[in-house]
């Protein structure tokens, strides 16, 4: 694990510990997503998917989320559509063997450094929104 932290994977895929259980964390995230006019287009239950294929893993749910003001700017232009493979944004909620719940996401702001100005601006804006959603959802009451 220290080797992963040392090689920078956590700067590409930031991880936050949740003080809530997995289902509560998912529900808090969905509430924040919807309150900010984002949409949950799909929830992937990777534990159930793996179980269908004979693998037993700890719970993992991935929220696929989108906001048309961000995605529309990319999808309206032919040149930018190439990054649609990274869409929609994803937030992963999972348990680890320590029994705690964690939230991870991709850091598109890092990738935006090699993008054209419009794509970089959109990616940075979406990343900021997603980070606000996560931080707000993980706040303890």
PLM regions: where:
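Compact, glycine-rich, soluble single-domain proteins
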Residues: 36, 42-49, 53-89
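Terminal, regulation- and interaction-focused segments at domain boundaries
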Residues: 1-40
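Beta-strand/loop substructures that line and gate deep hydrophobic ligand-binding cavities in soluble
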Residues: 90-116
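Short secondary-structure transition/capping segments
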Residues: 84-97, 134-141
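Short beta-strand element of the conserved SAM-dependent methyltransferase core
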Residues: 14-16, 63-66, 93
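Short glycine-enriched loop/turn motifs at secondary-structure junctions
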Residues: 8-10, 34, 55-58, 96
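Short intrinsically disordered coil segments
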Residues: 78-81, 106, 120-121
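Well-ordered alpha/beta subsegment
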Residues: 114-141
């Amino acid at each position: 694990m220290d080797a992963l932290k040392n090689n920078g994977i956590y700067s590409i895929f930031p991880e936050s510990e949740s003080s809530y259980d997995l289902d509560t964390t998912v529900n808090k995230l969905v509430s924040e997503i919807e309150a900010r006019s984002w949409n949950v287009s799909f929830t992937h239950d990777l534990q159930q998917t793996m179980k269908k294929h004979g693998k037993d893993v700890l719970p993992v749910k991935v929220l696929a989320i989108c906001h048309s003001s961000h995605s529309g700017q990319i999808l309206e232009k032919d040149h930018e559509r190439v990054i649609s493979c990274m869409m929609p944004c994803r937030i992963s909620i999972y348990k680890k063997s320590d029994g705690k719940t964690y939230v991870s996401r991709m850091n598109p702001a890092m990738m935006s450094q090699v993008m054209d100005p419009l794509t970089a601006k959109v990616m940075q804006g979406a990343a900021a929104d997603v980070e606000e959603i996560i931080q707000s959802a993980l706040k303890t009451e």
